[in-house]
Amino acid sequence: MADGTQRIGTERSGAERMDAEEGETAEEGEAVGVRRFWEQLGLPGLVDVHTHFMPESVLKKVWAYFDGLGPLTGGVEWPITYRAEEDERLGMLREFGVRAFTAMLYPHKPGMAEWLNQWAVDFARRTPDCLHTATLFPEPGVAEYVRRALDDGARVFKAHVQVGAYDPADALLDPAWGVLAEAGTPVVIHCGSGPSPGKHTGPEPVGRVLARHPRLRLVIAHTGMPEYEDFLDLAERFGEVRLDTTMAFTDFSEEFAPFPRRALPRLAGRPRPDLSTRLAGRPRPDPSPRLADPPRLAGLGDRILLGTDFPNIPYPYEHQLRALERLGLGEDWLRAVCHDNGARLFGL
């Protein structure tokens, strides 16, 4: 990040994570750091709306794509930090204190989404702390299988415009967007042009979708990286649009897609009365007066959600949290982003 950013705490170095306490494994040491982060904020844990679980055969292909520096990586080296079996990855999130997470899965061709959704039903049944996730693709019958996924208990959808190489405003998707808008079900959508642009990435296609479905609860993945300000514009125009923090503000992403510091006040605003007071039993001070509401609407402080991209990240999980912390937007903002906003959205 640029010089002058503020840290509320200190991120532990790799060596410190390895040797945090005598007898700790590296994983245990990292869990201590993550838990310390949210405990110091008085939170009951974290709500992470952007984590990836999918059939093992698919996930291994995703990892191989990153290893091979496929075109959509933008040619950036991307070592997978949490390359492990499913049970181990689930155990890591639980050790970190992530009380709710997702299984972001996505098709790259027709005929794949419904199969992924069937897998997700079983995964949700055996993983109660995972928010039941489903996906979609522009193809005949998409509205019908979206309805079936909702009937099966889906609580969040994933759309990946970059990987799927489709226009989100495709007429085939229009009925499905209508179903999801009517249901009030959030859709985490990778629609920004990072780390590599696609034919249909960027704010314009998403703007056309929202013009037709203004109540659609889109969660813009990666804060819209690198078109951050354009997607903030959309969030300010459409009250149900949210943004997740996935990979944004980290040292890794700042190298190729730095977040403009002039836009930081737009992320703030004043969070709504938080849930963590009730859940953690801790009193909360009044919001800091220096975080006054930006002039456009009341700010987006209650519509920014924690996302990380676990396990497919090239740095430790804790780094995403510390990257948010060092923005200097205050502890109330961190509580809202890392827990309360997601808990409210999903009724946790």
Model regions and ranges:
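Short, acidic/polar
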Residues: R83-L93, W115, E139-A149
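Conserved, mostly hydrophobic/aromatic
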Residues: H50, A120, A149, F157, ...
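Short, well-structured secondary-structure segments
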Residues: L90-L93, G97-M112, W119-F137, K158
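Active-site environment of divalent metal-dependent phosphoester hydrolases
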Residues: H52-S57, H108-G111, E139-V142, G164, ...
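Catalytic pocket-lining loop regions of alpha/beta-barrel enzymes
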Residues: R155-A159, Y166-I304
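Active-site mouth loops of central-metabolism enzymes
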Residues: L72-R83, L131-P140, V163-D167
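Mid-to-C-terminal alpha-helical segments outside catalytic/metal-binding sites
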Residues: A2-R7, D19, G23-V49, V58-F96, ...
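A generic "structured core" feature
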Residues: V47, F53, V209-R212
